[in-house]
Amino acid sequence: MALGRPSYRGGRVSGGRDPDFAELSSSLEQDREIFHCDVWNSVVHAVSLWEAGRIDRSTAAGIVEGLVTVLEEGPDRLPEDAEDVHEAIESRLHEVVGEEAGWLQLGRSRNDQVATSVRMRLRERALDLSRELVGLGRALLDLAREHAEVPIAGYTHLKRAQPCTIGFWMSTYAAAVARSARGLLRVPGMDECPLGCSAFPGSTVPVDRHREAALLGFRKPARHCGEATALRGPILEFLGRLATAASELTRLAGDLIQLCSDELGVVEPPDELSSTSSVMPHKKNPDALELVRAELTVVAGLKGLGDAVHGKLPMFYNRDLQVLNGLLWDSVNRFELCVRVLRKVVEGLDVDEEAARGTVLGSHAAAVDLAELVAERAGLTFREAHKVVGRVSARLDREGVPMSPERADRVVEELEREGVKLRVEEVREVLSLKRTLRRPVEGSTDPGRLEVTLDRLRAELAAAERLEGTWRGRIERALRATEAAVNRLGVEGFAEVYRGYWDGEAPG
């Protein structure tokens, strides 16, 4: 499709673009992500120009009505050889309404335009991500509550360390998920509107930036025009929080892969989220978890690429920042899909409680409790008791004797060799699974304490859900306010069409 007027070329730069440069510079495909936000952005700017007395009512109405048409048509009707979505929308608008479209960019640069549209879309995607994380968090809490008292070995350095429960293990990840669900909605600067900053020093047109911010659902205008257009602090902060969440969920995927190994066999993912071998008919492989682990690793790595692109750029705006937008949407898309898959895996997990108990039985995982008993009863410092129990553990391990209640008498014999005398009954008690799970501190694996923790985490997820609702309510009120503003121009239907994009039911 030929590029409709007006193109940004034909003034200081004449002629067409070199085809290789055109391919390099085009961001149209990634800009589909912000298409509807950019139209809303433009509608509000047209209203602002009218309210500032810079264009008349008829011109403003024609522009806004044309923008509603562009929104209804969808991104597939945009010129394919435009440099970006901003040029494409303006060009298509010119085809729809004629020369009046040329007034739209008065007092606005692509710099504040793209910064605003990206924040608007990122806000929408953050709300969706938070909702998905809340769903995953609740699935983890349901799993944790169901198996709150089922013992399993906790590992450090991939060696059996101390007993905990399946509930404690899964709730550890639920706690991280709850933090991320809130954190993605609390990125500094996300609720500040760059519109009106122009290229970087501020617009020469006296638009009401507070009014623009309110109509677009922001809490306030960005406080510094240069920072809002030249830097990408909120995007990098968001990528950082996404990377942290991704790295934590990578570990969840890895743990589940390990727990479903033949050697442990504690969990098994559902068939619909597993694969088989092309040659070995007996295999059931956790492919979904392996792919999630890899994809989330990419998400974590994209933050570093974003820093590399952004870092060392001179003030103020540089075209390099276009690449950063692509990294952002790539991260968001990968992350959202992985969270959905993880939730389905967690909801469909089959847990073998006996296999979980088997990871603790026959081990020396209660050695810490024994060392504390030795320190208390024998009058040794903990460091001295630590060494005593360490030597006992080494000898028993060489002989293949577990540090278990059933072999408490053997443990007592070895302690006596170290000059420590304890009763078999008290050693048997401290080595029992029930006893080793009792931890009298807040947030511990103790089943009673864990129940309190699970309730608290469920409340945190509910708080994240309320925060999401608050944000969605603000956007909806802004959409209604924008609709009221364009109604004053005699134009109707903008909000209804926009909601279709927000609900994922838009054309294109």
UniProtKB/Swiss-Prot annotation:
Protein keywords: Amino-acid biosynthesis, Arginine biosynthesis, Cytoplasm, Lyase
Family annotation (Pfam families): ASL_C2, Lyase_1
PANTHER family linked: ARGININOSUCCINATE LYASE (PTHR43814:SF1)
Subcellular location: Cytoplasm
GO cellular component, one term: cytosol
Entries under InterPro entries matching the protein: Arg_succ_lyase_C (IPR029419), Argininosuccinate_lyase (IPR009049), Fumarase/histidase_N (IPR024083), Fumarate_lyase_fam (IPR000362), Fumarate_lyase_N (IPR022761), L-Aspartase-like (IPR008948)
Name used for this protein in its record: Argininosuccinate lyase
EC annotation from Swiss-Prot or TrEMBL: 4.3.2.1
Gene from which the chain derives: argH
Gene Ontology biological process terms, A to Z: arginine biosynthetic process via ornithine; L-arginine biosynthetic process
Reactions catalysed: 2-(N(omega)-L-arginino)succinate = fumarate + L-arginine
Pathway entry: Amino-acid biosynthesis; L-arginine biosynthesis; L-arginine from L-ornithine and carbamoyl phosphate: step 3/3
Family according to the record: Belongs to the lyase 1 family. Argininosuccinate lyase subfamily.
Enzyme class: lyase
Gene3D superfamilies, per the entry: Fumarase/aspartase (C-terminal domain), Fumarase/aspartase (Central domain), Fumarase/aspartase (N-terminal domain)
Single Gene Ontology MF annotation: argininosuccinate lyase activity
